[in-house]
């Protein structure tokens, strides 16, 4: 299977799962990936979904930072793209960061996960508006 097709299948599975909660622009959430979270079967990684209400044209930066695992982010929009924005290490080594201009108004799903199989541990998820904020502190795990 082509890599992007596998990603589309994974994201369709994720979109059917429960959301952990809602995060707004300007918010920070501290939580943990556990073995009780949603499992992305192709990668055997745990994941959480967070709902974000976005406006067309709004620029946001989404940061996922962890000292316990190599953070990975996906963003599913109201008009799901076959190539959704994703990131592994733009936040500095093992932290993930997405900065983008939202193409549509509606509910987005932020998928917080790891690039490592069965990884668990604490993380911080932050959504900011406007220009890209300063770089995250380097991962120290």
Each model region followed by its residue ranges:
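Noncatalytic accessory or regulatory domains flanking protease catalytic cores in secreted, cell-surface
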Residues: 54, 71-126
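Non-catalytic extracellular/lumenal accessory regions of secreted precursors
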Residues: 12-59, 85-88, 93, 126-141
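Low-complexity, polar/charged sequence tracts that form flexible coils or short amphipathic helices
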Residues: 44, 63-66
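Short proline/glycine-enriched turn/loop motifs at strand-loop junctions of beta-rich domains
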Residues: 57, 66-70
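Mature, folded catalytic cores of secreted/periplasmic enzymes
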Residues: 1, 39, 62, 105-106
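Sec-dependent signal peptide recognition
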Residues: 2-10
């Amino acid at each position: 299977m082509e890599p992007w097709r596998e990603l589309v299948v994974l994201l369709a599975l994720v979109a059917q799962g429960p959301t952990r909660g809602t995060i707004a622009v300007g918010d920070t959430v501290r939580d943990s990936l556990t073995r009780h979270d949603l499992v992305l079967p192709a990668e055997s990684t745990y994941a959480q979904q967070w709902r974000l209400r976005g406006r067309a044209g709004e620029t946001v930066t989404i940061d996922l930072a962890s000292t316990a695992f190599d953070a990975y982010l996906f963003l599913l929009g109201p008009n799901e793209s076959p190539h959704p924005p994703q990131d592994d290490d733009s936040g500095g080594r093992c932290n993930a960061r997405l900065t983008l201009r939202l193409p549509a108004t509606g509910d987005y799903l932020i998928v917080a996960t790891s690039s490592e199989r069965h990884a668990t541990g604490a993380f911080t998820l932050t959504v900011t508006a406007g220009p890209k904020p300063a770089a995250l502190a380097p991962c120290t795990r």
